[in-house]
């Protein structure tokens, strides 16, 4: 580990990395005593605390369900659901990293995929939307706030990167195969940060 920011516009922070290929996922965490690598059966990731904590913490939420809950409290009491989604009561809603990990895991494992790549990409961003940080809700310094600057995913088979930015929620795609992959120069694209509103009428 070195105390060198990879981007001068972003604060120095402990980074955690998730590496996935097809159906296998690992977590890489650079720590003071070296790199720690873990298999990641959950296939989501959050920042500190370390990954083993997040994995163990899921045990506290194994009772959550997408189904309508049944009365396990007391058979003698007439307890009924009065709203949809009550099977997920207790799902943490705060903005801490540990809570966002649980929320991302629950959403990922209970959401439904689509039939097309576009539907699956859209669903991916909905899953990430369940844990995104809104500007103004988490103050880190006076006048400075943590928020989700961008979200991204990639179709590794086709070499297509998809992303959204905080102010531009339209999904943007960058296709690597439309570039010269044998070239020697780095090709960069600016993040499309400004809102892109489709005016239907």
Predicted segments, located by residue:
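C-terminus-biased signal that marks the final domain/tail of proteins
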Residues: 2-14, 21-24, 44-201
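Acidic, His- and aromatic-enriched active-site or binding-groove loops in soluble protein domains
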Residues: 28-46
């Amino acid at each position: 580990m070195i105390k060198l920011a990879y981007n001068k516009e972003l604060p120095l922070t402990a980074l955690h990395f998730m590496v996935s290929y097809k159906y296998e996922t690992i977590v890489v965490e650079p720590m003071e005593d070296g790199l720690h690598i873990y298999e990641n059966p959950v296939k989501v990731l959050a920042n500190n605390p370390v990954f083993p904590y997040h994995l163990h913490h899921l045990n506290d939420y194994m009772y959550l369900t997408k189904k309508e809950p049944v009365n396990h409290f007391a058979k003698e009491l007439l307890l009924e659901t009065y709203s949809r989604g009550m099977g997920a009561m207790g799902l943490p809603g705060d903005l801490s990293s540990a809570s966002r990990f649980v929320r991302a895991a629950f959403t990922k494992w209970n959401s439904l995929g689509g039939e097309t790549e576009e539907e699956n990409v859209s669903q991916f961003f909905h899953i990430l939307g369940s844990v995104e940080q809104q500007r103004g809700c988490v103050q880190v310094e006076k006048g400075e706030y943590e928020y989700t600057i961008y979200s991204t995913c990639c179709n590794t088979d086709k070499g297509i990167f998809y992303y959204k930015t905080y102010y531009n929620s339209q999904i943007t795609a960058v296709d690597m195969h439309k570039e010269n992959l044998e070239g020697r120069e780095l090709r960069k694209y600016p993040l499309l940060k400004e809102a892109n509103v489709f005016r239907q009428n």
